[in-house]
A protein has these predicted regions:
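Active-site environment of divalent metal-dependent phosphoester hydrolases
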Residues: 95-99, 118-125
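Active-site-adjacent C-terminal substructures of enzyme catalytic domains
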Residues: 1-37, 111-113, 120-167
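Polyanionic/metal-chelating signatures
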Residues: 1-114
């Protein structure tokens, strides 16, 4: 849900009219840390988890066709992503992880709307431009953890120039 930063008593009062729903997902160190006791604590383990979750959502969509009364909250949101009803925002720092998430989106038929943080977005600026993916980037904050080391102060300019075709 997209919210307006306004004084209100309830979240529905803050909702931006007619804005699409969105889902923010993380890649990299955060899911490795959070899910380490439930899955392999590696980037490959993360990708396996992403793919398994999307396969589960595809199966859920098939079940809904035969039994519309069947509800599975765990898969409902990702089914909305696969149907294009929910926009995807991805929290990624590294270029290889952004490229991997783009590949997963292509595999399952959805598009990533925005990459957040993206300290290595400059490395794949042309790919982001070609795919029409927005990048919400920090101007001057990096190096606070290992996956956020390899940035340049020109990150935003490089990504913007690729988008404009002037890079």
């Amino acid at each position: 849900v997209t919210l307006k930063n306004v004084s209100a008593n309830t979240v529905p009062e803050m909702k931006f009219p007619d804005a699409p729903h969105s889902l923010k997902m993380a890649c990299g160190e955060n899911p490795k840390r959070v899910y380490s006791s439930r899955a392999p604590s590696t980037r490959m383990g993360n990708v396996a988890g992403y793919r398994n979750a999307r396969i589960g959502a595809e199966n859920y969509k098939e079940q809904l066709e035969s039994d519309p009364s069947h509800r599975d909250i765990r898969n409902e949101t990702l089914a909305g992503v696969l149907d294009g009803e929910i926009l995807v925002h991805n929290h990624c720092y590294r270029a290889d992880e952004m490229a991997t998430m783009i590949n997963i989106g292509e595999e399952f038929g959805y598009k990533i709307s925005t990459f957040h943080h993206g300290v290595e977005a400059y490395k794949i600026a042309d790919l982001l431009a070609d795919e029409g993916i927005c990048a919400a980037l920090w101007a001057d904050w990096w190096g606070f953890k290992h996956e956020a080391y390899d940035m340049t102060i020109a990150n935003i300019a490089i990504v913007d120039q690729a988008r404009e075709g002037t890079g």
